[in-house]
Amino acid sequence: MNNKSLLDLSSEPAIKDTDILSYFDANLPFKKRHQIVRSIYHGLKYYIYSSTSIIQVWQNIQDFISTKNDNAAFRELVYNLMMRYVSTQKHLSIIERHTFFQTIEKDPFQDIAELQLRLKSLSVLTDEGHKISGIENRVGPLLSAWFNQYLQWQSQATELQGKDADSKLVHLLFFKSLFKFSTNLVKFQWFLVPEPQMLQLVNSVVQICNHARLEDVVTEVLMFFDSMIRYSVIPKASLYDTVLILCSTYISTYSYSKLAQSVIFNLISSPVSNLAFENVFNILQYNRSNVNAVRGAVRLMRFLMLQEVKNDAIASITLSSSIEFTEFPLGFNENVDFEILGTVYLFLRTPSILNRLNFLDWHRILNILMYCSQYLPLKASTSKEAFSKTAAFANIYDRVLDFLDFEALIPLLQQFQVKLVFFLKDVLPVLKPKIRKKLLRLFETYNLIFPCNQYWVFNLEFLLGIYQCKTFDLEDRALLFKLVEDACSVADENSAPILCSKFLFPVIESFSKESDDCVVSPVYNMLFFLSVNFQNPGLKDCIDHIFQQLISDTSSVTVRRLATSTLIRLFYYYYDLRDAVPIQETLAKMLEILETPSFPFVSRMLCLQFFLRFRANGTSIYICENIDLNEPFKVLNVDSELIPAVYPISDSFVNSATVEKHIWERKENDLIKISNHSTEYGKDFVTFPTSSLLRFYRKSMATESNWTILMFMITHLADQISNRSMFIGALEEIYNLLDFMCDIVFERVSISAEIPSNIRKANIMIPILQNVQMLFVYHDQFSRAQEDELVSVFFAGLQKWNEACHVSIHSLMLCCYELPVSIRKQLPAILVTLSRLITKPDLSVHILEFLCSLARLPDLIANFTDADYRQIFAIALKYIQHRDFTKESKDSNDTESILKNSYSSYVLALAYSVLQIWFLSLRLTERKKFVPWILRGLKLASEGKPLEDLCLVQYDMMQQFCYSNSDINNQTSTFVDSDVESETWIRGNSLFTINVSVNSGFLEAVIRRPTGTTQYTFRNEASLQKFLWEENLTSSKALTRGLLCTPSSFVSHFLDPHGISLYNQPLLLPSNDDSVRRAISVFDRIPVIESLKAGLVYVGYQQRREADILANTNPSEDFLTFLNGLGTLFELKTDQKVFAGGLDRENDIDGAFAYCWKDKVTQMVFHCTTMMPTNIEHDPGCTLKKRHIGNDFVTIIFNESGLEYDFDTIPSQFNFVNIVITPESESIRRTGRQIKFYKVKALTKYDIDFSLFRRYKIVSSDALPAIVRDVTLNAAVFSHIYHRSAGDYVHIWAERLRQLKRLREKFQASVLPEDYNLDEQTKTKLQNGTNFSDFTSYL
């Protein structure tokens, strides 16, 4: 190869090794060598050159990077060539690495771009610091020189500030890359570097950290030191500087402080940890030049103690030595002192450290606290201006004193008490409230104002002076009163008068304008305590005087409220002590406050709350706690903050020997008797003024001017007046109250209070009607006229007040069961009104449930006219026609969406149920006239849409029972002859089976429909005629045997002689097809009426636990009476036709008997736990009972426990509704009297609002079984819908219809020819199985 071809690069694809070895040397022209090098550089992508060739090239291009050549592009090419070559070599020889390194090391150019290129080349050459063999003695000094060069650039920071941001960024990137390489070198090859060179590099890093800008270098320096600690060892000579840097960065507020903490933790866990701690101690003891380092050392000692680091090297560092070294730099610098004070604070707030402090530790801590107090702004002086952290010191003192354990200081008080107390008193005027409270806590801790202290009177006067000078804020004064209150709780006969004269009475003189609870309440707590514990006539007179003064208009609202609260607490005290005279006096006084409009609102409101909580059982009065204060605000938008609460008495005043804790709730007290008079009382009993209280309620509705009091009374009255035992003796006032509330509804009278603008009058009628509804508990005492008035008032509420319609509907439903005579004549008008309310979607469930319940009361509907029935059918049809088709997605798991969809499906199910029940309740002769009318309504509902299954089964039901009044049943074949010819046809939505006996001539017709199966038996007498008229028929003459007729011959008699259209032909099913036999068998096993189940649980006296409740087998007579009214007893083994709901029929596992109920379309079995066997020994948890109750969607709870029943008492995944029945009187077992009225309430798993008993109702024992059963039926249907995630309700008839449709669709194609085209109308008829025509026109 000649020189020309060597230079003619365009004619050669690459330069080969032989070419380089033969022709390339330093004598070639510079530009030609540059071209060849570029060609080699590019050729390295595809060709691997030998190391000899590359070394020869490298040695002959050294002038490219000499100072004589200032072309940066040439130098860049040289380094790129080297980097590309190295990247192609799997293993680089030591000679090659040394040769390349010499060039990098001796490169004379020092600008930032050249250094970056050299650093990059060095990184490639050493595989990013992983391989330094051959250059291990020289790489350290090179890196040190580069660090020094960077430090030189940092010293010229002023010049760099004038440069653009890009230049600064380039310098910073080089620095980071240099540190990254150095860190890798330390990680992987530091053991090869000699210690002097190692020390040289570390010192350069230290110089960088000490002179460069901290935020630029600290993270990289920390990573470098971390790598050195973890993978190698820090040279001993540089360890002090390293620890100094780590301590300085540890106190930084930047993000790298956590990194510094991690590095320090690694250092103290390394082999040089002992030396590291020596350097930390030296910094604390001797370093007085680097503030940050000293602060960091203090913080490090704190960290070791707080984190309790487990390490052999620091095992000798105890808490005492840590506090000792922390105290060393005290006074060096303000910031250091602040760090030391912060360390003391953190030690004091850590219980594990606080408990380990000894005498000497406390001595040093107090020295620190007292020395650092000079930084606090104690006095107005010029010296305090020198301190920049005054506020911070004050704040940290607040925290220190919060955690200062004075109990631990008790052994030191002899030496430090005077200094400490005077110190706290001095700082009191300028320190924050928390610190000032420490002074009060000191009084509290050492009982300085307790009578047991010899200076307690002097200290008490000192506290009085603090209160009177008003230097304390509100919270401090409240704490001050709390201290005196505690001292009052341990007072005796001698100290009580002194306490009153020296503190209590002087405070009271200037007390009436106080407005904060925490200041006022302790005074009343002391008044209460002294009143009930000491017979001090002067104090008693003072209390009476104060009550008269505080109830007046000159006192603040807080004073009035707490004065009334004290009066109530006094009543509770005497109630618990059963002291009749003061009980009667306080009752009379509070009733006077309540009845007097001129008394303050807050006092009257508290008394109203007090009286509304009273309840009675058969023999005594008790006070309940569960009164919902927020109930008025849900309907009437009253601000809850307007309702005052009784301030609770301090726990320190509860004398367990004589007084229970004063909360609202109180158990029975037979000391208080029920009376109609408010003035009668005796030595051993108290009469409760029920008549006076009722009189106030009625008068309040007429004359009360305060809206809040009036509404609170109206909205909470229902719970109290439903307590029959309490007011049964005041019937005259009950009658008056009923008359007045009826007048309000009829708008004969009006309330006098000014109604707020945001409250509608209809909203007020809701609680009024609820109150009238609760008077059902007295209806057995009402006259016929009063019962009629009750029905009329609810009907008026239905007509006049839209917002109260749901209350009126529920009340009218109760009237159907409780007052049938009074409501019977009103029912037609009620139905007309309900038909006008169907446009209100929120009333749909209530209206339809009302109609369903009404249909099950035959005595009420016996005189219904055609117009009444049409109203009912019209309501149901309207709901079907306007059902909600805009359901949420069925895949949605949102509870709110599921509830919304469930309501929609429930309304549709109720509407069809109304059609079915009411149609079957018609007299047989009247049914025909309503069929066309109902069909028109159903067609309107399905216009433009396919007929629903529920619509089709309604049609089928009317077809089957329009002319028949037989029971809906599932009859089966009764043939006993095994030789039978059978054929089955599908016609429309029915199966028509003909069974012909071959031998006897009997013929059986079985018609299977969605709404029932009917069986008829026939006999062909024609074949027997000739034998019947023979006089002498001998035995030798046998009857003709064989098939007399086929099933088809019987069916032919019912065919149209004019022919049947193709789509209307009966479909003959294959008689020998197993799938047909299986389908018919499955169909026959589907029940013909809706079968539901519900749990029935008896809860005995004081029972709470599930196991105890389920184990009951001996219920009360009232429960048995209720059970007998609920259903009919049947035997599980013998009554196979009755739906058992999963109960065992073979082995009496679930008992021998059960209760069920059935009407024409529905049956329900009750899983009664008391009728199931109980075996505590083998089944202590009664799981055999729980397997039924736990799977019932609805459970009836007959609760005679005397306790509130919780929904989760018997937890179950599938139990959605609990209908809880509770006797109106609490103590049934103790009174032994007949319980006639019950509270019934539906508890739901979710916020489901569908039931009559969503809010509890009062029901008599006579009506209880029927109304509970009807609500249980509805709840079971709704629960089925909800359990299906709001899917459509599948009625049992609809399920039978679907089975028929599947069978018809399977064989339909065999009847129609392949080329037969059906129009849409015909397809619809085939799909529906009927033309939905009016069959009464030809029957």
Swiss-Prot record:
Chain positions found as Phosphoserine: S1036
Main location: cytoplasm
Domain of life, per lineage: Eukaryota
Cell cycle in keyword set: no
Cell compartment(s), UniProt: Cytoplasm; Nucleus
Binding partners and assembly: Interacts with tsc1.
Alphabetized PANTHER family for the sequence: TUBERIN
Protein name, entry field: Tuberous sclerosis 2 protein homolog
